[in-house]
Structure formats: C-alpha cells, structure tokens
Amino acid sequence: MPPRSTRWLCTAILTFVLLVSGCASDEVGIAAPDRSPVQSQISVAAPAGDVAPAQPEYIELRSSDGTTYLSSPIHPDPLYRGGESGQVLNPVDELPAWWAESGMPGTSTEQTVVVAGHNYSKRDAPFKALRVVTPGDTVVLRTASGTLEYAVESVGPLPKGSLLADNELRRSVPGRLILANCDVQGGEPTDDNFVVVAQLVR
C-alpha cells in the first residue's frame, strides 16, 4: 500500500475496524475472491437530487468500467456492539450489516457510514470480495430513499480489535463510507480486518 494511503487509513478510520468473531469454519473450502461479473440488482441510476438518510438495503461493488462483481442484500437488522466487553461487532449471518452507531446513508449525512460483514476461511460470504476492491472502484448503496454512489479511495488490512470507544480518530466525515470484514489470506484467517474507504460522489 502506498505510504500516503497507509497514513490516511491509520489516522482517519482505525477506530472503525471491527473485532468480528466467527470467521473460521469447518466446512469445505471456497474459491478465492475475484472480480468475475455478476448480475446487478440495482438498476436505477443515482438521482441528481438529495437522498434522505435511510438504512441501506442493498450493496454492490463495481469496477471502474461499471462491471458489477458483488451484489448482495444488507441484513435488515442493524448491527450493534456485543460480547462481554461490548466492543465486538458480530453480524448474525453471512450478510453484511449496517452499524447502527454510524451514520445513516444519505446525501446530507454528516457522520461516517459503516457496513461490516463476515469473511470466512471455509465457507462463502459476500464480503470476501473486499479483498479484490481497488481504488477507483464504485460502491453502490440502495436505500428506501434512493441510490448512493461512493468512489473507493483506500483499501488495506488493519489489526483486529482497533478502537470502538471514544477517540480522536473516530471523527465524523460527511460522505465517507467504510466497509470492513475479517481478513482471510490463502484460505486462512488472519489477525486483521480488511477495510475499504470510499467517499460519496452522488
């Protein structure tokens, strides 16, 4: 990762990295993530006007040429902290989930929006695709209010268990979207989360 991207990630969004449990599994192995085209489920173009804040319902990842390589529902139930420490974000199943303490997606949202999901070493999950996201890709969120598009600015691994408490690093940035999962490399779980940082474009 270029030094500038590393500094930006570490100083701006370190505290949004989640400690996600349940990333390992005893089931059969799965294919490595790739950018193979999939059918898009978000066909309506992002509107030119404002989109009122609303909980996200669907997420897609698209390459710079507009090819969709991830299309997934977002879990209807918001994600909350759990675990004995109260510092664990653990989605209930393989679907990504919106973190209820973060901003609600919309063109006027002042807070950073966070969507987190599992990535398993031995079974499939939509957010395994985060590993193949590159800067310049597009993240599309569909809500009940409309569709939002975000340009990916930075990607990379960060240590699990980073701050979820009050900290200067956990600042609100209008239009910012963070995607995070358990990082898996070579079919094995790591001690990192993989984080994608994107900025609202329309």
Where are these regions (language model features)?
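Bacterial N-terminal signal peptides that target proteins for export
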Residues: 1-10
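Sec-dependent N-terminal signal peptides
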Residues: 11-16
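C-terminal motif of bacterial Sec signal peptides marking the signal peptidase cleavage site
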Residues: 19-22
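Solvent-exposed, non-transmembrane regions of membrane-associated and secreted proteins
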Residues: 24-134, 143, 154-202
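Structural motif
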Residues: 137-138
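Short coil-to-beta-strand transition motifs
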Residues: 142-149
